Amino acid sequence: MLVHPEAMSVGALADKIRKIENWPQKGILFHDITPVLQSAEYFRLLVDLLVYRYMDQKIDIVAGLDARGFIIGAALAYQLNVGFVPIRKKGKLPFETVSQSYALEYGEAAVEIHTDAVKLGSRVLLVDDLIATGGTMLAGLELIRKLGGEIVEAAAILEFTDLQGGKNIRASGAPLFTLLQNEGCMKG
């Protein structure tokens, strides 16, 4: 049973996100979504907010980024009655893959998708938990495009606006929706 949109409070969801100072390193204010996931009420609120946004957009498939995007994306795909595609860290998928690298603060990483995961012309919603610099989301968007998918939207719970990730995603031509915006994850 879906929660009616008028009963939904994004502010309540924001209050449930735990902030942890100096993790994973000094100077970072980590935003932990696990309290949202641990609560049946708030997890349902999160998924229902996204379901109401996308239920009439003719989504063919939901793709989720490793790892928290899997949790949100799979639940959303189930409610939308569409399939789910994981976009994993390099070396974690067993079948033929296509890969996309992205920059990290120090170095580079890559994500992969199975070559048969997205059919040509499929309408794809890409989901993750948060947007910081946007590198992972941009790499996921590029993988979907490489396979011929049409990006309906990129979606996340939280965007750190001062890190410019949302701006970078929009500049790539992908629409972006986030439930919450925050000025950043840097302490100080």
Curated annotation (Swiss-Prot):
Cross-referenced InterPro entries: Ade_phspho_trans, PRibTrfase_dom, PRTase-like, UPRTase/APRTase
HAMAP family (alphabetical): Aden_phosphoribosyltr
Keyword Glycosyltransferase: yes
CDD domains attached to this UniProt entry: PRTases_typeI
EC number: 2.4.2.7
Family from the record: Belongs to the purine/pyrimidine phosphoribosyltransferase family.
PANTHER family listed in its UniProt record: ADENINE PHOSPHORIBOSYLTRANSFERASE
Function: Catalyzes a salvage reaction resulting in the formation of AMP, that is energically less costly than de novo synthesis.
Subcellular location: Cytoplasm
Record keyword RNA-binding present: no
Keywords from the named record: Cytoplasm, Glycosyltransferase, Purine salvage, Transferase
The name this protein goes by in its record: Adenine phosphoribosyltransferase
GO biological process: adenine salvage; AMP salvage; purine ribonucleoside salvage
Organism: Neisseria meningitidis serogroup B (strain ATCC BAA-335 / MC58)
Catalytic activity: AMP + diphosphate = 5-phospho-alpha-D-ribose 1-diphosphate + adenine
One Gene Ontology cellular component: cytoplasm
Subunit structure: Homodimer.
Annotated pathway: Purine metabolism; AMP biosynthesis via salvage pathway; AMP from adenine: step 1/1
An example Gene Ontology molecular-function term: adenine phosphoribosyltransferase activity
